[in-house]
C-alpha cells in the first residue's frame, strides 16, 4: 500500500488497525541503507520473532522439583542454573527462577526464605574493633609470593575468627583461596595459644599441601610463629584494617553467617552443627569455580598435580 499514493491514516483504516501501528511497523522494518520500508525484511523479522516465541522457556515440574530441592540446600538460583549445566540437566534461566520464587511469595509460599539476604553494605574494619594490637615478628602481605594471587594452587589459606554474642565464644574459619575449601572449628575464646593449637590440628590431614596462611591483625594470631613452624609454612598479615586483602575469607564468613547469624550465642552451637556447616559449604557449587564444589575443585587440582609430577 505504501507503493500507491495512500496516507498512513488511510492505510490504517483500510486494514483496520490504529495509525500508530502503521508508524511502528514502518520504523521497525525500514532498510538501514535506503531508509525505505522493506516488506521482505519485515517478513523475515516476523518469522524470526515467531520462532523465538516458540523457544520460550518451559519451566517443567521436574525443574521446579529440582529447584525446590537445591534451594533447601541453600543454593542460589544462579548456582542452581550453573550446577545444572555442569551436570547436563535442563534448566531455565536464573531470572525465571527468581520470578517463580517471588510469584510463590505473593501466593503465600515460603520459597523466598531460602534466598540469602542481598545488598548488605560493605564496611571496613575500623578502630571500634577490639582485639587489635602489636604482634611480634609479623610479616606483611607485601612479602607474600605473587603466585598466591593467582589462586591456581591448593594450600594458600586465609584465616579469621567470628565472635559470638557479647564477645563470648568464637569460631575459627580457614579457607583455601584456590578451591574455597573451608575448615570451621569452635573456640572457647580468642586466646592465641589455643587458637594456634586448633589451627594446626584442623589442618593436620593436609599439612604437606599447605604453602601459606594469611591473617588479619587480631591478637588471637600472635602465636603465628608456632603455626608456621608446626605446619612448615609461611604466615603473613594484612595491612591494618585492610580486611579486603582476605577477600575469600570475608566471603566465607558471610556464608557461615547464613547459618549462625550475628547475635547468636555460640554456646548453643554444637560441634556437630559446625561440622554440618563445614560439609555443606564444601559441597556447595560456586560460580567462580565453574559451579564445581570446593571438594570437587580440590580433587581436580590434586589429580592435575599428580599427573604433572608422575605420581
List where the protein language model places each region.
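Short, basic alpha-helical/linker "hinge" immediately adjacent to a nucleic-acid-recognition surface
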Residues: 3-74, 78, 82-83, 89
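Mobile genetic element proteins and their domesticated derivatives, centered on retroelements
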Residues: 22, 67, 80, 97, ...
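Basic, flexible linker segments flanking DNA-binding modules
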Residues: 40-45, 91-149
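An active-site-proximal beta-strand-loop segment
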Residues: 139, 143-182
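Active-site beta-loop-alpha junctions of metal-dependent nucleic acid enzymes
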Residues: 164-167, 184-206
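RNase H-like two-metal-ion nuclease catalytic core shared by retroviral integrases
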Residues: 215-217, 222-225, 237-260, 267-279
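Short, structured coil segments at secondary-structure junctions
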Residues: 230-231
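C-terminal domain-tail junction helix/linker
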Residues: 262-311
Amino acid at each position: 500500500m505504501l507503493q500507491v499514493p495512500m496516507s498512513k491514516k488511510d492505510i490504517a483504516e483500510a486494514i483496520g488497525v490504529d495509525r500508530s501501528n502503521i508508524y511502528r511497523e514502518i520504523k521497525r522494518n525500514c532498510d538501514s541503507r535506503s531508509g525505505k520500508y522493506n516488506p521482505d525484511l519485515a517478513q523475515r523479522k516476523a518469522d524470526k520473532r515467531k520462532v523465538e516465541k516458540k523457544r520460550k522457556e518451559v519451566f517443567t515440574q521436574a525443574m521446579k522439583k529440582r529447584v525446590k530441592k537445591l534451594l533447601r540446600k541453600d543454593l542460589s538460583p544462579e548456582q542452581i542454573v550453573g550446577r545444572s549445566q555442569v551436570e547436563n540437566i535442563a534448566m531455565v534461566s536464573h531470572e525465571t527462577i527468581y520470578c517463580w520464587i517471588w510469584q510463590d511469595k505473593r501466593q503465600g509460599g515460603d520459597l523466598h526464605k531460602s534466598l540469602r539476604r542481598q545488598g548488605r553494605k560493605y564496611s571496613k574494619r575500623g578502630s571500634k574493633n577490639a582485639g587489635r594490637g602489636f604482634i611480634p615478628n609479623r610479616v606483611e602481605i607485601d612479602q607474600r609470593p605473587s603466585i598466591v594471587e593467582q589462586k591456581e594452587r591448593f594450600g594458600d589459606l586465609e584465616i579469621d575468627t567470628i565472635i559470638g554474642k557479647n564477645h563470648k565464644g568464637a569460631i575459627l574459619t580457614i579457607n583455601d583461596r584456590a578451591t574455597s575449601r573451608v575448615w570451621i572449628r569452635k573456640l572457647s575464646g580468642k586466646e592465641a595459644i589455643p587458637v594456634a593449637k586448633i589451627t594446626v590440628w584442623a589442618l593436620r590431614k593436609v599439612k604437606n599441601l599447605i604453602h601459606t596462611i594469611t591473617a588479619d591483625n587480631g591478637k588471637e594470631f600472635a602465636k603465628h610463629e608456632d603455626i608456621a613452624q608446626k605446619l612448615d609454612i609461611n604466615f603473613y598479615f594484612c595491612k591494618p584494617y585492610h580486611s579486603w586483602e582476605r577477600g575469600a575469607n570475608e566471603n566465607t564468613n558471610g556464608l557461615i553467617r547464613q547459618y549462625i547469624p550475628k547475635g547468636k550465642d555460640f554456646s548453643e552451637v554444637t560441634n556437630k552443627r559446625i561440622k554440618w556447616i563445614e560439609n555443606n559449604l564444601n559441597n556447595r557449587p560456586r560460580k567462580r569455580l565453574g559451579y564445581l564444589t570446593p571438594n570437587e575443585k580440590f580433587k581436580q587440582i590434586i589429580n592435575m598435580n599428580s599427573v604433572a609430577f608422575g605420581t
